[in-house]
Amino acid sequence: MAKFKFKKGDTVEIIAGDDRGTKATVLAVLPKKNKVIVEGCKIVKKAIKPTEENTKGGHLNKEMPIDVSNVRKVEA
């Protein structure tokens, strides 16, 4: 298995997709899936069903993983 070049806390730039040109911080690394989760990028709205703790339910904005081929490390 090849060494993964990103780690949590790195500053990266999105080089492909809707968020192209955005510089942000890596929140999580998923080496088995070859993806990273970047702060504030690729945000989707998830529906939350009502539960005992959250009786209303509602919507949650969540960052989704981005393939590492679409991300470039930026030297701080």
UniProtKB/Swiss-Prot annotation:
GO terms for cellular component: ribonucleoprotein complex; ribosome. InterPro entries: KOW (IPR005824), Rib_uL2_dom2 (IPR014722), Ribosomal_uL24 (IPR003256), Ribosomal_uL24_CS (IPR005825), Ribosomal_uL24_KOW (IPR041988), Translation_prot_SH3-like_sf (IPR008991). Gene3D superfamilies: 2.30.30.30. It comes from the Bacteria. Keywords: Ribonucleoprotein, Ribosomal protein, RNA-binding, rRNA-binding. GO terms for biological process: translation. PROSITE patterns: RIBOSOMAL_L24. GO terms for molecular function: rRNA binding; structural constituent of ribosome. Part of the 50S ribosomal subunit. One of two assembly initiator proteins, it binds directly to the 5'-end of the 23S rRNA, where it nucleates assembly of the 50S subunit. One of the proteins that surrounds the polypeptide exit tunnel on the outside of the subunit. Belongs to the universal ribosomal protein uL24 family. This is Large ribosomal subunit protein uL24. It comes from Sulfurimonas denitrificans (strain ATCC 33889 / DSM 1251).
